Amino acid sequence: MGARCLLDLECAVTKSVPFSLLELASVREGDTVGETLANSVAYARHAESLGFQRFWLAEHHNMQGISSAATSVLIGHIAGATESIRVGSGGVMLPNHPPLVIAEQFGTLESLYPDRIDLGLG
């Protein structure tokens, strides 16, 4: 890909530049956590239909407006609702989790959804 193509987004997309999205699962005013998680699934499906390579989920705790505290659970839910997009954690905060539990959870997810699960650590 030449320098000219790097400056042209349309050209870059046609050259298969991998794009990813980071989902915070923000709860909008008036929505429930369930609605927010359903929106996250719809967002991932839409990203997949547009050819995005990866869908990252952020981990946040003790925040009423963010519904992605149980990242591995949400990753499994979204991977099960999509077909090909990679799904991963945009930073599992290891000080908050026993490392063995994280390894087992993500190993299980990888077994269920081969070559589609990514583990980001923070």
Give the location of each predicted region.
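Flexible, glycine-rich active-site loops centered on histidine and acidic residues
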Residues: 18-35, 96-122
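Glycine-rich, flexible loop/turn motifs
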Residues: 81, 90, 108
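Generic structural signal for well-ordered secondary structure
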Residues: 67-71, 95, 102
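Structural motif
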Residues: 58, 90, 120-122
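N-terminal beta1-alpha1-beta2 module of alpha/beta enzyme domains
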Residues: 4-87
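Active-site nucleophile and cofactor-binding loops and adjacent substrate-binding regions
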Residues: 89-97
